[in-house]
Amino acid sequence: MEFEDDAFVLAARAHGETGAIVELLTSAHGRYAAHVAGGASRKVRPFLQPGARVIARYRARVSDQLGSAAIEPVGEGPAALFDDPLALSGLSAAAAVAAGALPEREPHPGAFLAFEALTGALTHPDVWPAVFVRFEAGLLQDLGFGLDLSKCAATGITDDLVWVSPRTGRAVSRQAGEPYKDRLLALPPFLLSAQGGLRAGDVAAGLALTGHFLEAFIFGPLNRPLPPARLWLLDRLSEAGRL
């Protein structure tokens, strides 16, 4: 089995004296693990940081066994964010969420595009936290657990949608949800429209929303918690006053 594909590095760990096992999110083939010869070397290791954009040439003798990959870096990757530790935390958290949520060797082009959009936004400090929420919503969508924010689940109206049912992932209008608001999840307006700026608390509400469904539908059934990198990101965003 052989293919060449655009990819993002999700994780890498040393293997043997000089090699590395690398988790890749590829554009057309999904999440793949591969052995990279020399991946632990000073020359190659900088290209294998979480979030790095690469071209991967994958080869395996048997399709269901671990293959090898030759990696060619594309652009600066995480190095462009070295002066922004918070953005680097966002990139690491996104890589950890994707690595934990996506099944191996199953195409998920929507997840790749959502990750790509986030990496493009990370140099814009006022924008990327909201794009991170959209990335997680896109990941849920691509895995079959998309939020239905098109209309109120109770009445069918499309205006004044301010909550989401934690059970179904469907939007609820202010009037219909008022009696049950303590049991509903807040719906930040930026998930409904790209128009307008962020309000205080919108990013926190968005992360609580996507985090709930990632935990309920993806990580929980696998008996795994949300990745520590995501929890650290919330702490750092809070410390920076960015929630």
From Swiss-Prot:
Entry keyword set: DNA damage, DNA recombination, DNA repair
GO BP: DNA recombination; double-strand break repair
GO CC field: bacterial nucleoid
The organism's place on the tree of life at top rank: Bacteria
Pfam families attached to this UniProt entry: RecO_C, RecO_N
Family under the similarity heading: Belongs to the RecO family.
Function: Involved in DNA repair and RecF pathway recombination.
Protein name per the record: DNA repair protein RecO
Source species: Phenylobacterium zucineum (strain HLK1)
